[in-house]
């Protein structure tokens, strides 16, 4: 068990709540118009990165640095900062860059706060959908959609009868293996 001071949850949760709102405003004011796409992979393969990925990450990093200047930050586009802090922010500025590029609204900004390597808070923000999810370790999770907050919980009576699975495997899971997914469930 880690010795994270749980009294600090409200500080970080408040920051992430505001950051989700700010990221949505940032997207709507600047990033939903035009962007450029390039390939991060040299040679074989294709891993797209957009100017929006980079802009989101810079925006997130600036907010973290302003509020928590001693914390370490690791981001997909700009790597890590050097810090001896027990706190590390992990950023995927656009999870689902391929969806972003084609205009599918299911991409998100993913941000995790880790304490001594253990995730303690996580944010999944969907700017186009005006929705975000926030979880506090394994204790509490909620969704904010269209400004309304709803606590999430595990359904103790869940069955797999009505489960739907969606994924984008982009070459790392063969079509043959993808066909076996329904059998697993």
What is the meaning of each model-derived region?
Residues 1-94:
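N-terminal subdomain of lithium-sensitive/metallo-dependent phosphomonoesterases centered on the IMPase/IPPase/PAP
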């Amino acid at each position: 068990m880690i010795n994270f001071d749980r009294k600090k949850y409200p500080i970080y949760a408040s920051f992430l709540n505001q950051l989700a709102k700010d990221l949505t405003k940032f997207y709507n004011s600047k990033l939903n118009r035009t962007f450029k796409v390039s390939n991060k992979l040299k040679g074989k393969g294709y891993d797209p990165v957009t100017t929006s990925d980079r802009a989101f990450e810079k925006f997130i990093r600036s907010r973290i640095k302003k509020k928590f200047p001693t914390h370490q930050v690791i981001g997909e586009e700009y790597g890590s900062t050097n810090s001896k802090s027990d706190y590390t922010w992990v950023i995927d500025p656009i999870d689902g860059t391929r969806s972003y590029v084609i205009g599918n609204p299911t991409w998100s900004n993913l941000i995790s706060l880790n304490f001594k390597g253990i995730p303690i808070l996580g944010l999944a923000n969907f700017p186009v959908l005006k929705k975000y999810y926030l979880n506090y370790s394994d204790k509490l999770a909620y969704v904010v959609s269209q400004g309304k907050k709803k606590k999430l919980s595990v359904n103790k009576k869940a069955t797999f009868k009505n489960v739907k699975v969606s994924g984008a495997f982009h070459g790392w899971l063969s079509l043959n293996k993808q066909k076996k997914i329904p059998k697993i469930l």
